[in-house]
Amino acid sequence: MGRLREKVALITGAGRHRGLGEGIAKRFAEEGAKVVITDIGNPGKNLPAGLIGTTEELEGVANGIRGVTNSTVLSMICDVRSESDVKSVIGATVKELGRLDIVVNNAGIGYIIKPITELTLDEWDIVLEVNLRGPFLFTKHAAPVFIKQGWGGHIINIASQAAKSPAPQLAHYSSSKHGLIGLTRTAAAELGNHGITVNAVCPNHVTTGLGEVQNQRRGEIMGMDVSGVLDFRKSKIPLGRVGLVTDTANACVFLASADAAYITGESLNVSGGEEMH
């Protein structure tokens, strides 16, 4: 413990209990970081119910992390598609906590499962806006803060194994995550001379709240119940189980720590061997 002591980490899309963002924020706090968690909050109610955390749930996540880690945890509302929101959250983080060391671009949408011929333009656009525009905006506006501080920084993008292999009925999601790998590599090349590392983590299926929705939808498509979907997923994984939130969170801790100081531009598979390139 203590690998991130006194660091300040900002994690987007962390306003849901049992979500990846909550798990990442908790692990960072356990390692000594001061943490800022964001989510879209109540403005996200125009999106499908149950997939977007409310303002109250975001604060509940923050309280939960404080309770088990005794760390500083701030919660802020942010629509990652909004440049003004992104700038405001970064500015508030530096004002409140005095610095910014780590950004984890975790906010993402993956609930729409349709063949290309049935996808609407609105469905395509919202996935690309959240999954790719959001990380672009946080990279764009966090990098100058890192440069001004003078001691580098870490940007970690939560991608997916769908960033490396075809994902039928997820053309929008897969395209956004392939694009995120491109952004990761390009930003790493541009920002490395400032001591800024930029990496991606590529999990396979993780049964979060969103993952449960995906399993239900997959079951409808495949004509099986959720347990059948999980058995099918496990059959493709050499280590024999689906991913856990802690698997992804631990990878993020590593990439944000001094142990990964010489690693940048990489996309780290966290998939139990399901993805091997």
Residue ranges of each PLM-predicted region?
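Residue(s) in the substrate-gating loop at a strand-loop-helix junction
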Residues: 160
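Active-site helix of classical SDR
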Residues: 139, 176, 184
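Short C-terminal tail/terminal secondary-structure segment
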Residues: 110-113, 165, 240-241, 252-254, ...
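Short, small/polar-rich loop/turn modules that mediate ligand/substrate recognition or access, typified
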Residues: 192, 197, 263-265
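Substrate-binding pocket helix/loop in short-chain dehydrogenase/reductase
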Residues: 114-116, 123-128, 233-234
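The beta1-alpha1 cofactor-binding region of Rossmann-like NAD(H)/NADP(H)-dependent oxidoreductases
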Residues: 55-59, 77-89, 121, 247
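Canonical Rossmann dinucleotide-binding motif of NAD(H)/NADP(H)-dependent dehydrogenases/reductases
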Residues: 2-37
